[in-house]
């Protein structure tokens, strides 16, 4: 490899895309590789008008596209993705927007590195809501 190619590789700036997806909303937060500095932050509620549309895959796609555009402007070429559901005593599965957000980030031109699930899992934490016999449907 020549010196020019080495310099190009060094200048590639990567970030982390934190995708928090619940059944009420989807939040896409792109940070630098350390996670300390915010580069872009968008949510489903920022891109659609109706409250009922916030958790939809469409809203997640729009939010992810806007976040990716901002990140590309600031020089980010690729992201590692960290998907998170509410977790704890709440739902441990990501909402409907998580998949759509990942796809939208890839389509927007960002390289995708690792995809990992960082949902908090309780090691015998608080008691789940619903009482002794659970929610009766």
Swiss-Prot record:
Keyword tags: Ribonucleoprotein, Ribosomal protein, RNA-binding, rRNA-binding
Top-rank taxon: Archaea
Region (Disordered): 116-137
One GO BP: translation
One Gene Ontology MF term: rRNA binding
GO cellular component, one term: ribosome
Function comment: Located on the platform of the 30S subunit.
Family, similarity comment: Belongs to the universal ribosomal protein uS11 family.
Annotated NCBIfam families: arch_S11P (TIGR03628), PRK09607.1 (NF007176)
Assembly and interaction partners: Part of the 30S ribosomal subunit.
Protein name: Small ribosomal subunit protein uS11
